[in-house]
């Protein structure tokens, strides 16, 4: 019995994580809260991506696709109009 008690005492003295102070608890639970927040944000981004926006306005800078007009020229026209508006 004495040998097992001695080995337990030796193991307890080698345990450097036995006593936790407030700072280590704060770090641990802060990491849990941060991970939960990231999970919620990523899941919201994935779920919101599939929902179509019903109030989309093409004049807010979004480029909608038209037939026969390439994207590059449309972007150029939008920039040109914005430059004229600033004059």
Curated annotation (Swiss-Prot):
Residues 52-87 are annotated as: Disordered. Keywords: Membrane, Transmembrane, Transmembrane helix. Residues 73-87 have a biased composition (Basic residues). It is found in: Membrane. This is Protein anon-73B1. The chain crosses the membrane at residues 25-47. Pfam families: UPF0239. InterPro entries: UPF0239. GO terms for cellular component: membrane. It is a single-pass membrane protein. It comes from the Eukaryota. Belongs to the UPF0239 family.
């Amino acid at each position: 019995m004495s040998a097992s008690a001695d080995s337990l005492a030796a193991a307890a003295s080698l345990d450097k994580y036995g006593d936790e102070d407030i700072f280590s608890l704060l770090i641990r639970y802060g990491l849990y809260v941060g991970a939960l927040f990231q999970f919620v944000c990523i899941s919201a981004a994935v779920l919101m991506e599939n929902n179509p926006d019903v109030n989309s306005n093409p004049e807010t800078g979004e480029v909608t696709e038209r037939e026969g007009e390439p994207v590059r020229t449309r972007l150029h026209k939008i920039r040109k109009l914005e430059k004229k508006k600033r004059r």
